[in-house]
Amino acid sequence: MNEQLKEKFAQYFGRKPEYVFSAPGRTELSGNHTDHQHGCVMAAAVNRETLAAVALNAGTVVNLYSEGYSLISVDIADLTVHPEEVNSTASLIRGVASKFQEYGLRGFDAYVTSNVLSGSGLSSSAAFEVLLGTIFNHILSAGKSAIEIAQIGQYAENVYFGKPCGLMDQMASSVGNIIAIDFADPAKPIVTPMAFDFATSGYRLCVIDSGAGHEDLTDEYAAITRELKAVCRLFGKEFLRDVAEEAFFDRIAEVRKACGDRAVLRAIHVFEENKRVALQRKAIEENDFDTFLHYVRESGSSSWRQLQNVIPSGWKEHQEVAFALALAEKLLGGRGAVRVHGGGFAGTIQAFVPEDMVEAFCAGVDKALGEGSCQIMSIRKEGGILVEVCA
């Protein structure tokens, strides 16, 4: 794949690349929508990646061609936020570059290819942000850590791209393997590598494409953080991690009246989900995969009933994620586990499938949702990396 990528770079830019970089997609294993409330998560890098062949150029322009899209050229001598670039690739390039300006910015040409498909639930945007951060970090000899590169990606997405997001996606992509993250202090998150070999669990991790895209769903995601912030304000706090659960339940009638029932239910989900992360982490540390799966099921139920990130508001005829969850549960027949992961509302769901059921399970999913809808994942040990210095 690297050789093909280098050839495509040469054909497009008329010269040979100097480097090849890679950043993986990720899957959230535990902690749905807890990261933006300074909570806890478990996540893993997966064997889907965004690759870039790169060569420096003489100026301060980043010329980036991504397969299937038009060439994007961004002069990073200008690092101001451009309102017209909101929700664009250009905004991410400028946003990531802004955090490297003290190292003397250099322009580069990049040919990008990816099998972390947009809307796949594997966080293609985070993989792209980590890829950009890894490129700048190397070509400028900036010496940023994997954690710092993740934080830069989140900053670019929040401030330049205009999408509120937590830090889990970027952290999992940047660090790699299976990790537990405590975001109590997001400036200094506690990242703990998990010494667990998923391949020995007796299960396969499957990601199922529901067929629903993330277009026009930014308001749905923003509503979650907005409603949780409203709850926090009643307690004089900014994030739910800092709100005492006992105080929340003592004043729950007041919270319902001030914020509405959906906000209350979403807060209950976050309180309980943080506890589940700790219990799942303990189960993994003790090699107790059955207990881990028990809490996967609980997480999925809570996301659907309380967090309510399965069906977008007002959607009646199209409820693709809900259908995919129901289909997967039917095919599993009480075994394994299934849950919505990541942002929810669209994209993919996650299933833990017993090895003896994988073939029949994927066939059943593909029959109902279309060929290739069920993808079997493996855990990738590396995060964002320099793959090759080209000769």
What are these regions (language model features)?
Residues 1-20, 24-40, 73-78, 85-200, ...:
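Gly/Ser-rich oxyanion-binding loop with an adjacent helix/lid
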Residues 346-347:
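Active-site pocket scaffolds in enzymes
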